[in-house]
Design a protein with these regions (language model features):
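Basic, Lys/Arg- and aromatic-enriched nucleic-acid-binding interface segment
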Residues: 7, 118-126, 137-200, 205-206, ...
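N-terminal core-binding DNA-recognition domain of tyrosine site-specific recombinases/integrases
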Residues: 3, 17, 23-29, 55-56, ...
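Short, surface-exposed polybasic/aromatic micro-patch for ligand or macromolecular engagement
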Residues: 2-57, 231
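Short, polar N-cap/turn motifs at the start of nucleic acid-interacting alpha helices
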Residues: 202-209, 293, 312-331, 356, ...
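Short, basic (Lys/Arg/His-rich) helix/loop patches that form interaction surfaces
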Residues: 118, 169-179, 188, 238, ...
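Catalytic-site neighborhood detector that most strongly recognizes the C-terminal catalytic loop/helix
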Residues: 30, 153, 203, 216, ...
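C-terminal secondary-structure termini that scaffold catalytic or DNA-interacting sites
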Residues: 172, 207, 216-237, 242-244, ...
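Conserved hydrophobic residue
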Residues: 49-50, 141, 313
Length: 386
């Protein structure tokens, strides 16, 4: 219900919201007051009406409880979101009321952050947009103010790829008890947390497979977290390439305890391996081989790129990598220079075959004659060079 009454030289519109509370606005002209009241009634009828008081809540006052109730997030993801909020979102936008967080305000914040930290700006923008979508769903604001085109795109540099020979050299450069970590990361395309979570029970040498059932990660606070992979796609069984089986068999016999829950990737004394120890050994190995540009995760990237080069389909790459969407697997469909050259040669071969099939017998005879080196050329002195 809405009414419009004269108040001195102005017109006051009164609108009763669905909660029974009255909201008033004063306008210099009667028509403006009537239009406002009609607009409020229309929003209410369409289910789009929002209590103006909701928009007074600040970004920080909404974002903090939002993150606290996200029980579906992993510990590492919560830490990342907390870092982005405290370091890049709340210092600039935390005190801004939700209703005042307009697209222009967001665009100005993003532009400033992107000049300093492009990749971080993309991550922070995606998080802010996610929070604002929640604010829209909670009817705190009418629309998402995050409207920067491409704001959430990271444009990260293409990650380096190790060759098969380089992976072998990197494995040899690792301490003996960690050599198999390099082989599994590359040939079985395991993530670091999956490597550290691998147990004896997860390895089936008889059938040549390993199961990704547990991951181990370290929080920013230094606590080790052991849990199941965060997605259904991440829980998978991977076929072990036959070239890795002998090394893995020897590793299990020499370094891994008989208990089914014994860790496969172990420390020097046979205990659980700490992530920082693996990182330190990896840093030394890549320096020894001359590939300091490679991260440990790039071994997985390299292995998936090899798989794509053999002709693996997107579905096959998704299953092996534990990806839940085709978008993640598509990045491995890019061709290396060697693969691209092989494709070009194959295409040229198709063209040659088509040409040979189409020429006449007389042309074919001419080609055979012209392909023989002439006697004069065979005995001609070589041209001098300058």
């Amino acid at each position: 219900m809405a009414t419009v009454k004269r108040r001195g030289n102005a017109w006051q519109a009164t609108f009763r919201g669905p909660d029974g509370r009255e909201r008033t606005r004063t306008f210099p002209r009667k028509v403006d007051a009537e239009n406002w009241a009609a607009d409020e009634r229309s929003k209410l009828m369409r289910g789009e009406w929002i209590d103006p008081r909701s928009g007074r809540v600040t970004v920080k006052a909404f974002a903090d409880p939002w993150l606290a109730r996200r029980q579906d997030l992993s510990v590492r993801t919560v830490e990342l979101y907390r870092y982005l909020l405290d370091g890049h979102i709340l210092p600039s936008l935390g005190g801004v009321p939700l209703a005042a967080l307009t697209p222009s305000v967001v665009a100005a914040w993003y532009a400033k952050l992107a000049t300093e930290h492009k990749t971080t700006a993309a991550k922070a923008y995606r998080l802010l947009s996610q929070i604002m979508r929640a604010a829209v769903a909670d009817r705190m604001i009418g629309s998402n103010p995050c409207q920067v085109k491409g704001g959430g795109v990271e444009n990260a540099a293409e990650r380096p790829i190790a060759s098969v020979a380089e992976v072998g050299a990197l494995a040899d450069a690792m301490p003996e008890h960690l050599r198999v970590a390099v082989l599994l990361a590359s040939w079985c395309q395991l993530r670091r947390a999956e490597l550290l979570g691998l147990r004896r029970r997860d390895v089936d040498l008889l059938h040549g497979t390993l199961s990704v059932a547990v991951t181990r990660t370290k929080t920013m606070a230094g606590e080790m977290i052991e849990k199941a992979p965060k997605s259904e796609a991440g829980r998978r069984t991977v076929a072990i390439p036959s070239n890795v089986v002998p090394a893995l068999t020897a590793h299990l016999e020499r370094y891994v305890g008989s208990d089914p829950d014994s860790a496969v990737i172990v420390g020097e004394k046979g205990g659980r391996l700490l992530p920082q120890v693996l990182s330190a050994s990896w840093s030394k190995a890549r320096e020894k081989v001359g590939r300091t540009d490679l991260r440990l995760h790039d071994l997985r990237h390299s292995g998936l790129t090899w798989a794509a080069a053999t002709g693996a389909t997107i579905a096959e790459l998704m299953r092996r990598a534990g990806h839940g969407s085709p978008a993640a697997a598509l990045r491995y469909q890019h061709a290396t220079e060697d693969r691209d050259r092989a494709l070009a040669d194959a295409l040229a071969g198709l063209a040659s075959s088509a040409r040979v099939a189409s020429i006449t017998p007389r042309e074919r005879k001419t080609l055979r004659i012209s392909s023989k080196p002439s006697e004069s050329l065979q005995h001609a002195p070589s041209a001098s060079t300058t």
